[in-house]
């Protein structure tokens, strides 16, 4: 796949930085895994919406790189963890996520958000792209378990963004950046659940925002938060909104209310 943009910016220097990282990662995996068939980049970078920032003249990918490694044989957790350690030692990234799928199990892949993204919104870094043909068609209509998953997965982001110093004004610029990043994860999580509930899942952050503004236009606070979170995700900046505390409290209420209503088996939307 040529001329792939790993972020929405379509900048040659951004793509070069990511590609250099991926070349190192590919070499490490191929050297360590004898029967590797494919290395697939999933997540934001895999669908051309990776979070990246230019800070103090340095190009910095934010969050993590997510990979699916296709092999003939099962990879143990030890092997995967050893690969992660080597990658983290050589590449300037906060975290590496690796999922191993055996070739024989591709045909058994079930309907899920992760598998939908793997099939339709990923970047094949290494191996024959015909491997995708082994993955069955996946419906964008998700099960109830999948709908609720983002509410729980990103609940941790809500907790991590809690103002431990009791006042966000005491935070440094960098601290505010990471706090706001966690807040936006929470926002993107509950908004994805709402879209899944109406059978409107889309891998793209940009498309999700457009769909949310369309289908939930009567929920002005929610629409505003989703727009803010999406803009930050795709166009990272160190300049964080001044009303950070207000955003946290509004978001907390929406996230927890959605979760509460879900558990009480009411219409959460």
Sequence positions of predicted segments:
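N-terminal regions immediately upstream of nucleotidyltransferase
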Residues: 1-34
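Conserved NTP/Mg2+-binding pocket subregion across the NTase superfamily
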Residues: 5-17, 80-185, 189-193, 197, ...
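Active-site nucleotide-donor binding segment shared across nucleotidyl transfer reactions
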Residues: 26-65, 70-75
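Short, solvent-exposed loop/turn segments at secondary-structure junctions
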Residues: 46-47, 193-195, 201
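Histidine-centered, metal-coordinating catalytic motifs and their short helical/loop contexts
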Residues: 220-239
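Compositionally biased, intrinsically disordered linkers/stalks adjacent to structured regions
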Residues: 242-243
């Amino acid at each position: 796949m040529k001329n792939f943009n790993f972020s929405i910016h379509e900048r040659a220097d951004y793509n070069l930085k990511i590609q250099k990282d991926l070349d190192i990662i590919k070499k490490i995996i191929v050297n360590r895994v004898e029967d590797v068939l494919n290395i697939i980049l999933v997540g934001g970078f895999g669908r051309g919406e990776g979070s990246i920032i230019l800070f103090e003249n340095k190009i910095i990918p934010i969050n993590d790189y997510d990979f699916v490694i296709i092999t003939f044989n099962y990879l143990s957790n030890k092997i995967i963890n050893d690969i992660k350690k080597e990658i983290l030692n050589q590449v300037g990234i906060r975290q590496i996520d690796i999922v191993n799928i055996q070739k024989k199990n591709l045909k058994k892949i079930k309907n899920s958000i992760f598998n939908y993204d793997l099939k339709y919104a990923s970047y094949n870094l290494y191996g024959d792209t015909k491997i995708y043909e082994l993955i069955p068609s996946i419906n964008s209509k998700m099960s109830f378990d999948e709908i609720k998953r983002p509410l729980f997965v990103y609940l941790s982001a809500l907790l991590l963004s809690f103002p431990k110093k009791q006042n966000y004004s005491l935070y440094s610029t960098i601290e505010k950046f990471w706090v706001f990043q966690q807040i936006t994860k929470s926002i993107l999580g509950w908004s994805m659940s709402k879209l899944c509930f109406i059978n409107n899942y889309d891998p793209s952050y940009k498309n999700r925002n457009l769909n949310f503004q369309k289908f939930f236009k009567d929920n002005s606070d929610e629409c505003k938060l989703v727009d803010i979170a999406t803009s930050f995700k795709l166009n990272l900046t160190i300049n964080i909104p001044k009303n950070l505390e207000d955003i946290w409290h509004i978001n907390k209420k929406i996230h927890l209310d959605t979760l509460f209503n879900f558990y009480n088996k009411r219409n959460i939307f």
